[in-house]
A protein has these predicted regions:
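A structural helix-start
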Residues: 134-135, 158, 162
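Conserved N-terminal segment of class I S-adenosyl-L-methionine
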Residues: 1-118, 124-126, 138-141, 156, ...
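Short N-terminal helix/helix-N-cap motif within the alpha/beta-hydrolase-1
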Residues: 135-139, 166
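Conserved beta-strand signature within the Rossmann-like core of class I S-adenosyl-L-methionine
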Residues: 152-158
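A short glycine-rich, Lys/Arg-flanked "PGG" loop and its adjoining helix->strand segment in the class I
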Residues: 139-150
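Short catalytic micro-motifs in class I SAM-dependent methyltransferases
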Residues: 128-133
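Phosphate/oxyanion-binding loops and surfaces in catalytic or ligand/nucleic-acid-binding neighborhoods
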Residues: 161, 174, 197-201
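Short, glycine-/aromatic-enriched active-site segment of Class I SAM-dependent methyltransferases
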Residues: 162-182
Length: 235
């Protein structure tokens, strides 16, 4: 059972520029472990069945797959069959659960800055409900492009913060997003802005939202993408 213990330090002295990456990783790990426990985010994944079906279809079999933000492996478990999967996450407690439950390789990493993996080493990278948590998604996407093989597949999803109901919420004076871990509110245009820097977008759909078939920008509750790496083989 995970202990519901508030992190001892949530706000380091930002004036001290010598705070190193290891301490940053530890602070973020404590924060996310606390958040996932208190907000009851463990052992669940948003739109799990629909997203896992889409991801499995797109990635296929016999692939080397990197799951960015695998957490406790709730979504990851759907595509480990006949694939070699490596999971990365900042939440150390959740990551230990993932390694134990799925018996896959995991790495405790703050991938918002750098991903310590070899260039052109993966066929597929998955980022399900991850990039909204990143302070600088352009850095992570550039790293994803580097790690992917030429023409490799980058798939993922992000909440569509500007779907119709959320726009009404804002008109009523409410916040567009009340999740304290979300650092960016994405719409179709912003998502394309980041993806197209490193990738070629093949598909952009929504896995939830009754009227999303009319317009994913207005009625899709999430945005689900399938991209190819722009990086080409050098012959």
């Amino acid at each position: 059972m995970v202990e519901n213990k508030k992190p001892s330090v949530l706000k380091p002295d930002l004036k001290d520029e010598r705070i190193n990456q290891d301490l940053r990783t530890k602070l973020l790990s404590d924060f996310y472990s606390y958040h996932h426990t208190t907000c009851k985010r463990r052992n669940q994944s948003v739109s799990e069945e629909k997203r896992s079906t889409i991801f499995k279809k797109w990635m296929g079999k016999n692939k080397k797959v990197l799951d960015l933000g695998c957490r406790d492996g709730r979504l990851t478990r759907h595509f480990i069959d006949q694939n070699e999967v490596v999971g990365l996450d900042i939440d150390k407690i959740a990551l230990e659960e993932c390694a134990k439950n799925l018996s896959i390789e995991t790495k405790w990493v703050d991938f918002s800055i750098q991903i310590p993996l070899q260039t052109s080493s993966f066929d597929v990278i998955v980022a399900g409900e991850v990039i909204e948590h990143l302070p600088c998604p352009a850095i992570t996407m550039a790293e994803a492009s580097r790690i992917l093989k030429p023409n490799g597949l980058f798939i993922g999803s992000v909440p569509n913060s500007y779907h119709f109901k959320n726009r009404l919420r804002v008109l009523k004076g409410n916040l567009i997003d009340n999740d304290q871990t979300h650092l960016r509110a994405y719409n179709v245009m912003l998502l394309k802005h980041y993806l197209e820097k490193e990738f070629i977008i093949e598909k952009l759909i929504s896995s939830r939202g009754r009227s999303s078939f009319l317009s994913i920008a207005w009625f899709g509750r999430d945005l689900v993408w399938k991209c190819r790496n722009k990086k080409q083989l050098i012959i």
